[in-house]
Amino acid sequence: MENDAGQVTELYIPRKCSATNRMITSKDHASVQLNIGHLDANGLYTGQFTTFALCGFVRAQGDADSGVDRLWQKKKVEAKQQ
């Protein structure tokens, strides 16, 4: 919900898992949000980052590493097309 000035006033904003598109509920204490920094050709941080959210289910199954790798490969392909 937003106030008259357009600022978000909610305490909880629901998120979706980037790997499975499942809703991350407020009681999912095993979920994580990762900010992965972008690097230039010299390996220096450019100030930009990409955010991925992983639900506890993905982490409990042991698929977090492969999920992040798959998401990052997809992100790199999208960046090359632009």
Curated annotation (Swiss-Prot):
GO terms for molecular function: structural constituent of ribosome. GO terms for biological process: chloroplast organization; translation. InterPro entries: Ribosomal_eS21, Ribosomal_eS21_CS, Ribosomal_eS21_sf. One of its GO terms (cellular component) is nucleus. The modification N-acetylmethionine is found at M1. It comes from the Eukaryota. Keywords: Acetylation, Ribonucleoprotein, Ribosomal protein. The keyword Ribonucleoprotein applies. Pfam families: Ribosomal_S21e. Belongs to the eukaryotic ribosomal protein eS21 family. This is Small ribosomal subunit protein eS21z. The gene is RPS21B.
